[in-house]
């Protein structure tokens, strides 16, 4: 089985953390590459991961969320301490490159207008009054998701083809 790539990372408050050390804290780790904190779609996903995190823990799984946001940006968010999982700050995009998580070729290529999930998320954004914040990183960055066992085996990977092409919590739970 293919091994997940190990890396050092920083959070809003800590530097020099090791991914392999974090992975050993649970049977399975959901490594999610999102865009940045100012992105409303990413905000919506973050809220869902937080609300449903107990389901991951019931499976002895954890989330490690990678954002292009800086530690300073995360520290400015008053609710950052309430996020129940690790949020990795990668403003230079080094981890995106390490895991070959690419960006869309153009802003239009980021969206699939025929994707029901896109429209469902757009409606949810409006209902929750989520607004676009500061731009950070590569604006055309696409998300990705990897499932990693406690011994660093990479047993599932998903590279998004559009901004809304990321597995739902229900889909992730089934894969665990």
Regions found by a protein language model. Give the residues of each.
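Short active-site neighborhood of thiol/selenol oxidoreductases, capturing the structured segment around
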Residues: 20-49, 62
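Structural microenvironment flanking redox-active thiols in thiol-disulfide oxidoreductases
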Residues: 45-98
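Short beta-strand/turn micro-motifs composed of small residues
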Residues: 34, 67, 149
């Amino acid at each position: 089985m293919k091994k997940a790539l190990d890396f050092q990372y920083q959070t809003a408050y800590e530097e020099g953390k090791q991914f392999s050390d974090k992975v050993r804290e649970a049977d399975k780790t959901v490594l999610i590459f999102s865009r940045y904190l100012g992105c409303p779609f990413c905000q919506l996903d973050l809220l869902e991961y937080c609300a449903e995190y107990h389901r991951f823990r019931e499976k002895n799984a954890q989330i490690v969320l990678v954002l292009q946001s800086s530690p300073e940006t995360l520290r400015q968010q008053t609710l950052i301490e309430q996020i129940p999982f690790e949020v990795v700050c990668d403003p230079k995009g080094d981890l995106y490159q390490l895991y070959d998580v690419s960006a869309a070729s153009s802003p239009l290529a980021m969206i699939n207008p025929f994707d029901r999930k896109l429209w469902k998320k757009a409606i949810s954004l409006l209902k929750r009054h989520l607004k676009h914040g500061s731009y950070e990183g590569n604006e055309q960055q696409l998300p990705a998701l990897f499932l990693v066992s406690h011994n660093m085996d990479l047993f599932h990977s998903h590279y998004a083809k559009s901004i809304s092409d990321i597995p739902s919590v229900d889909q992730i739970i089934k894969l665990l």
